[in-house]
């Protein structure tokens, strides 16, 4: 019996040693959903600082299918950090995990404002794999196109279709009006617009727009966090965290999967109910991990416009949809 026990211990130790040797022998690791830099560094017996150094990471942000170097030495300048050029003129850079507009600008001796202008960006959010122009002139697709000319209809007034990179102030300057006037014409109560949206730019406000949205916050007491976004890149949780930060109502980075957000938010002191407001978080437990969305607008007919990721498109792709009034109560709202 004693010999069998000793043999079993030796066998187990041998298996563990082989597994450890295989892990240590690996030079790269492909990130899996839910993994963190801590878990990966622990797996390969290296420090978080070493892992970040090997991969030129400036934050703890990683995303599924990203290939990380786990041994060897870091490259002072990787191929991806060198801008590519094309026949159309100008140079391009592919965004890496941990990049920011300011960091990219400093690499290529320009300003983040210039990169935003070159790429028609109207906010600071970029994502790994995104191709950004870092030198040259703004492409024609980012400049005014035929769609920048307002269309007219029999009901009076002119309309404009929002393009990527537009803002209310930019549109107003194109048509010799003010952003306040455009907001009034379209019944807008915030600055949020999205590509493909049709805006009235001249004429009179229609009755249907006079009360098209509500912004009543009902006096919610909202805690505010200033955490770093540690949610998995491209997921619904990642997007909603960023949108709340944009409006100055940052949330915790430790609520985990979407199906836990209502309970975690309640524990942190947030109000949870079934009444959507602009800026609130729509949450459901439906699905394996649940889902969260950001409420962009509450319409007069009871429907809501939401923005989300990883719902009707691949992770990292921002989409919008209108939730019908009869489905609004299917969600809980974090204020």
Curated annotation (Swiss-Prot):
Residues 27-70, 91-134, 158-201 form the LysM domain. It is found in: Secreted; Cell surface. Its main location: secreted. SMART domains: LysM. Residues 71-86 have a biased composition (Low complexity). Residues 211-335 form the Peptidase C51 domain. InterPro entries: CHAP_dom, LysM_dom, LysM_dom_sf, Papain-like_cys_pep_sf. It catalyses: Hydrolyzes the link between N-acetylmuramoyl residues and L-amino acid residues in certain cell-wall glycopeptides. This is N-acetylmuramoyl-L-alanine amidase sle1. It comes from Staphylococcus aureus (strain bovine RF122 / ET3-1).
């Amino acid at each position: 019996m004693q010999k069998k026990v000793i043999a079993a211990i030796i066998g187990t130790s041998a298996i563990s040693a082989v597994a450890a040797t295989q892990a240590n022998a690996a030079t790269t690791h492909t990130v899996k959903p839910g993994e963190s830099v801590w878990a990966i560094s622990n797996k390969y017996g290296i420090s978080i600082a070493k892992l970040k150094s090997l991969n030129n990471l400036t934050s703890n942000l990683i995303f599924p299918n990203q290939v990380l170097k786990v041994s060897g030495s870091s490259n002072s300048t990787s191929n991806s950090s060198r801008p590519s050029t094309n026949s159309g003129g100008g140079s391009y850079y592919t965004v890496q995990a941990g990049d920011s507009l300011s960091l990219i600008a400093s690499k290529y001796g320009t300003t983040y404002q210039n990169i935003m202008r070159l790429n028609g960006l109207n906010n600071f959010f970029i994502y790994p794999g995104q191709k950004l122009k870092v030198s040259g002139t703004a492409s024609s697709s980012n400049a005014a196109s035929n769609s920048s000319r307002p269309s007219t209809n029999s009901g009076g007034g002119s309309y404009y279709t929002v393009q990527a990179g537009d803002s209310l102030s930019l549109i107003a300057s194109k048509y010799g009006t003010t952003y306040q006037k455009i907001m009034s014409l379209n019944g807008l109560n915030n600055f949020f617009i999205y590509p493909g949206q049709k805006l009235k730019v001249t004429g009179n406000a229609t009755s249907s727009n006079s009360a098209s949205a509500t912004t009543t916050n009902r006096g919610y007491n909202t805690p505010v966090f200033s955490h770093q976004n540690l949610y998995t890149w491209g997921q619904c949780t990642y997007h909603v965290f960023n949108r709340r930060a944009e409006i100055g109502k940052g949330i915790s980075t430790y609520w985990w999967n979407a199906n836990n957000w209502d309970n975690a938010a309640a524990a942190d002191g947030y109000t949870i109910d079934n009444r959507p407001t602009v800026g609130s978080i729509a949450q459901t437990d439906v699905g394996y991990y649940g889902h969260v969305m950001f409420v962009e607008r509450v319409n007069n007919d009871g429907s809501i416009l939401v923005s989300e990721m990883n719902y009707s498109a691949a992770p990292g792709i921002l989409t919008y949809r209108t939730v019908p009034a009869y489905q609004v109560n299917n969600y809980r709202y974090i204020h």
